[in-house]
Amino acid sequence: MNGVEQTCASLRTQIAATEAKLADLKRELEIAEQAAASHKQNAADAEGGSERRWPLLDEEYRRYGRQMIVPQLGIQGQLKLRSAKVLIVGAGGLGCPAALYLAGAGVGTLGLVDGDAVESSNLHRQVLHRTRNIGKLKVDSAIEYLKELNPHSKYIAHREHLAPEAAPEIFSNYDLILDCTDNPATRYLISDTAVLLGKPLVSASALRTEGQLMVLNNPPRPAGDKTGGPCYRCVFPKPPPANTVTSCADGGIVGPVVGTMGVLQALEAIKVITADETTTPPPPSLHIFSAYSTPLFRTIKLRSRRPNCAVCSAEASVTVDTVRSGSTDYIFFCGTTGPENLLSPEERITPLEYRTRHHDKEEKEPTIIDVREKVQYDICSLENSINIPISTILASASSSMSNGDSLADGVPALPSWVPPDVASSQSTDPVYVVCRLGNDSQVAVKKLKELGLDQGGKRVVADIRGGFRAWKEQVDPEWPEY
């Protein structure tokens, strides 16, 4: 880059920084002016020496008027919203739209719990965060946006991951809880704490193109009271096996899908807050959203509280003390989902070791089997690699076991997906298996060896440790990270 180009680049950088600073100042001025107007209105009311003529500020009538004229809300509903205290656990794909609409609706106090920082991979779906806030704590990024949207509400940041020892104290300051998290252990913790402290809970989840929504512990009743709403344990007495739990990072998520579920959480929260106290809440239901189905929504009626529930039945064993002390171990209850070493060190090779061993060699290239699903393989792939999705491998293995297929000598029959070069009993060329993170590839190696493709130890069948994430770090910095 020559001197003129450097000057241009420097000027562009300075202009961008100045424009960003100007935008920040404009936002600060707007918030200050709105706060000044509210302060002026409050001062005028106090100076009058009498009670306010109207329960809301002039600006609040203008701001919330369009929803106050809806019969289901009205002025009483708006006053309930203004006095409500709502806690949102998780400031991600669910928490962002939920917080956005609750703040817009005029909820008086919004608390946000999250210990994560904003990453670029969040931005396609977590709509409160902006590019310039990458690296900033999510709760601070979200509250920054919410204050611009509605300076009349109070926002409380809990800059931490929800932990059992802190959950009861945090929850006690709020009227309603929203579960916007994405892992089973935290879901059970949130539900247990909400039930024990008598807080209604709006819970949602989303993955790929589908989502689920429930309103739990509504109405909130003491343990043993059958008229209370069911809790998360009533619906799911046993957590799913840890190895079946898929995160958005692994399974993917369409932004509007998780956005839809977050908006529905906000809607259900508003319904709970503004409900007539003399009206019985609707029966508990599980609402299932599927973006590529017709109809989009299905509703399943849920049972009432389970008679033997560990939290909300008369025989409850979970208490505030067991939660706070750690006696109720949620990690143990749900199991861990961390990566496992299924193979011995001799059956694994790092990307750097692979490159050193086989790069620029005149001998035949080893076979690389990429076990990512085709949709990921189409994003990026190694030259001359073979795509055999892990789902195909596992499905054929299950089918072979059920059919008892085998050759005359007892060796399992080879599935049709095995490449001819790999299937050949004459070949001893090494076979390496790779995936995104280095977990599925280990499973695939075990299956290949069960099929006898390692020729009784004569052929190397190994996993590339750490998958393509490690490949990017050790071999190819330009490898797409998704």
Curated annotation (Swiss-Prot):
One annotated GO molecular function is: molybdopterin-synthase adenylyltransferase activity
Q: Give the GO biological process terms.
A: cell budding; cellular response to oxidative stress; invasive growth in response to glucose limitation; Mo-molybdopterin cofactor biosynthetic process; protein urmylation; regulation of pseudohyphal growth; tRNA wobble position uridine thiolation
InterPro entries given in the database record: MOCS3/Uba4, Rhodanese-like_dom, Rhodanese-like_dom_sf, ThiF/MoeB/HesA, ThiF_NAD_FAD-bd, Ubiquitin-activating_enz
Q: Where are the transmembrane segments?
A: none
Reported EC number(s) for this entry are: 2.7.7.80, 2.8.1.11
Q: What pathway does this protein act in?
A: tRNA modification; 5-methoxycarbonylmethyl-2-thiouridine-tRNA biosynthesis; Cofactor biosynthesis; molybdopterin biosynthesis
- Primary location group: cytoplasm
Residue stretches making up the Rhodanese domain: 362-480
> How are cofactors bound according to the entry's free-text note?
Binds 1 zinc ion per subunit.
- Provide the active-site residues from the annotation: 248 (glycyl thioester intermediate), 435 (cysteine persulfide intermediate)
Q: Provide the binding site for ATP.
A: 93, 114, 121-125, 138, 182-183
**Which compartment or compartments is the protein found in?**
Cytoplasm, Cytosol
Q: Which UniProt keywords apply?
A: ATP-binding, Cytoplasm, Metal-binding, Molybdenum cofactor biosynthesis, Multifunctional enzyme, Nucleotide-binding, Nucleotidyltransferase, Transferase, tRNA processing, Ubl conjugation pathway, Zinc
User: Superkingdom of the source?
Assistant: Eukaryota
The answer to whether UniProt assigns keyword Transmembrane to this entry is no
Q: What does this protein do?
A: Plays a central role in 2-thiolation of mcm(5)S(2)U at tRNA wobble positions of cytosolic tRNA(Lys), tRNA(Glu) and tRNA(Gln). Also essential during biosynthesis of the molybdenum cofactor. Acts by mediating the C-terminal thiocarboxylation of sulfur carriers urm1 and mocs2a. Its N-terminus first activates urm1 and mocs2a as acyl-adenylates (-COAMP), then the persulfide sulfur on the catalytic cysteine is transferred to urm1 and mocs2a to form thiocarboxylation (-COSH) of their C-terminus.
Q: Which family does it belong to?
A: In the N-terminal section; belongs to the HesA/MoeB/ThiF family. UBA4 subfamily.
Q: What is the protein named?
A: Adenylyltransferase and sulfurtransferase uba4
The gene that this protein is the product of is uba4
